Regions:
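Amphipathic alpha-helical segments within extended alpha-helical solenoids and repeat-rich scaffolds
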Residues: 1, 31-51, 80-100, 129-149
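Hydrophobic residues within the alpha-helices of tandem HEAT/HEAT-like
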Residues: 12-23, 41, 58-70, 93-97, ...
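Alpha-solenoid ARM/HEAT helical repeat scaffolds used for protein-protein interactions
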Residues: 23-30, 68-81, 92, 118-127, ...
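Intrinsic disorder/low-complexity flexible regions in very large eukaryotic scaffold/regulatory proteins
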Residues: 27-33, 37, 54-58, 104-108, ...
């Protein structure tokens, strides 16, 4: 992104950007269409020890997958995030935001922001209906800590 514009003409740079965009859309569409894969991904996220390297890898994969959704059209993005939310995205984000690793909490925040972009209503519903309101509590604590310490997290201290 930084080096290529300096060496390529505008037309070639535009072509590369289009190829990257179409490839990202293809990756998201392919993974979204693979229901067993997504079910397995969320099952592993629920079953792995949050301190294990495997959990960290799965979280980073899910974060990247969520961030690729920005390249989708709004209707596709809504449908895709609805499916991810149905699989337990917000429950997983709740677990991630309670993690001791700040980089993983940042991943969780990024996933939450990606899920909010097409439609914030599912998150509002989840925050109200979640037993114990854990995610809401994490978000409030994170904002309070961030305000006072300039870096927030949800862990109980």
């Amino acid at each position: 992104d930084v080096i290529l514009p300096r060496v390529l003409d505008d037309q070639t740079y535009g072509t590369f950007n289009s190829l990257i965009l179409f490839n990202n859309v293809e990756v998201v569409s392919t993974l979204q269409g693979d229901k067993p894969f997504l079910s397995d991904l969320f099952s592993q996220l629920r079953s792995k020890d949050p301190s294990s390297p495997a959990f960290r890898d799965l979280v980073r994969f899910l974060q990247e997958f969520c961030s690729l959704h920005k390249h989708l059209q709004i209707t596709q993005r809504n449908q895709s995030f609805s499916a991810l939310i149905g699989l337990g995205l917000f429950e997983i984000v709740t677990t991630i935001l309670q993690h001791t690793d700040a980089s993983l909490r940042l991943c969780g925040t990024d996933m939450l922001m990606s899920a909010l972009s097409p439609d914030p209503a599912p998150l509002r519903t989840f925050l109200v209906e979640q037993p114990g309101h854990t995610l809401f509590s994490c978000l409030v604590k994170g904002m309070a800590v961030a305000r006072h310490r300039h870096h927030g997290h949800c862990r109980e201290e």
